[in-house]
Design a protein with these regions (language model features):
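Alpha-helical transmembrane segments of multi-pass membrane proteins predominantly involved
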Residues: 1-354
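A short, hydrophobic C-terminal helix/tail in secreted or cell-surface proteins
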Residues: 355-360
Length: 360
């Protein structure tokens, strides 16, 4: 078993790699900046290799702030794979748009770093730090193509609604802390186990569900998703629909299964209602779309409903099924957006026969 201090090696490798990409962006001549994509892929590969010693680990580090276990490892592999595929989708896209690759790839790595801390976080502080690292990176990436008005609008809308949802989530977490006296999820579960039902605790559950509901784009907290998905750069839309959703489900499982198992009847009922509304609304709205990215946005919303069913089950099999579904969804969704990127590269005349004039 590796030493205690080495458990953060993957995160340290990713952080150093992100800084290296920024340095290379300054040092490399403009004609050779295409190498930054390969450097970014190398960083992601090195981070993946750094995870290998911890396959069988099951420990808490940093005074109970972070857990190194198979649950976190599975999500980290999803994040790294989705980031790598996003980089591959972005190479030609950035050339066409004339955008700066160094900052772009740096932000992708920062978003991935935030997701990794979210997956391993077993403390409310760690979860919030990881969540905001990811969110701020996506706010910038959503509006990365500055001349594009829709991209700028998507970034502003995502930022404003994201800040509002964060406030709701923080309020719910502050109630959890106030009622338990700790921010560690497992200590919260222990503290709440002997307490009677408190209306403030029910309010905390509702607020946390609402805050995370925004992040996973569950109905009725989904209104930002279609506009942001449509306006953001296509590779970032792909990464946002996969990486951000997976990371949000990771903290959802951590908070409710580890932090508030005694409130199971309350949060299961809430997630059951959200799952039904999300599946129905997501699929019906997707049928009426004439823009492919908006259609995939509503498809992503519907998939959030399917994933919530595993949470509603609240059993080991339910969670396992949800994790398998999430892994398959990752590659399916990225493949769908890869088709959009491919179509965008082709001569538009080749697609004039399509019956949906605003397909892209």
């Amino acid at each position: 078993m590796p030493r205690h201090r080495s458990y953060l090696l993957p995160e340290l490798v990713l952080t150093a790699g992100a800084l290296l990409v920024l340095v290379l962006d300054v040092l490399l001549p403009r004609t050779q900046r295409g190498l930054l994509a390969w450097a970014t892929l190398g960083v992601l590969a090195a981070t993946t290799i750094a995870l290998k010693p911890f396959i069988s680990a099951h420990v808490e580090i940093a005074h109970g702030l972070i857990a190194v276990d198979r649950f976190a490892l599975y999500f980290k592999l999803i994040f790294l794979a989705s980031a790598a595929l996003t980089v591959l989708l972005s190479v030609r896209y950035l050339e066409v748009e004339g955008a700066s690759p160094g900052e772009y790839y740096f932000l992708i790595l920062c978003a991935t770093l935030g997701m990794m801390f979210m997956a391993g976080g077993i403390d409310l502080v760690t979860i919030i730090v990881g969540l905001e690292t990811m969110a701020v990176s996506f706010y910038i990436l959503a509006g990365f193509i500055k001349p594009n008005q829709r991209s700028n609008e998507a970034a502003v809308k995502y930022f404003l609604l994201g800040a509002f949802s964060l406030g709701i989530l923080l309020y719910g977490m502050s109630l959890m802390y106030g009622l338990s006296g700790t921010t560690n999820l497992r200590a919260i579960a222990t503290a709440l186990a002997g307490q009677e039902r408190d209306p403030r605790l029910v309010l905390a559950v509702i607020l946390v569900v609402a805050g995370i509901g925004f992040k996973i784009a569950a109905v009725p907290f989904h209104m930002w998703a279609p506009d942001v998905y449509e306006g953001a750069p296509t590779p970032i839309t792909a990464f946002l629909s996969v990486g951000s959703k997976a990371a949000s489900f990771a903290i959802l499982l951590r908070i409710f299964l580890e932090g508030m198992p005694t409130m199971g009847p309350e949060w299961r009922l809430l997630f059951e209602v959200l799952a039904i509304m999300t599946m129905v609304m997501g699929n019906l709205a997707a049928l009426t779309q004439s823009n492919l990215k908006r259609m995939l946005a509503y498809s992503s919303i519907a998939h959030a409903g399917y994933l919530l069913m595993g949470v509603v089950a609240g059993t080991t099999r339910g969670v396992s099924a949800m994790l398998i579904y999430l892994g398959v969804y990752t590659f399916m969704q990225l493949g769908a957006f890869a088709v959009i990127v491919m179509l965008r590269r082709q001569d538009a005349v080749s697609y004039t026969h399509l019956t949906l004039p605003t397909i892209l």
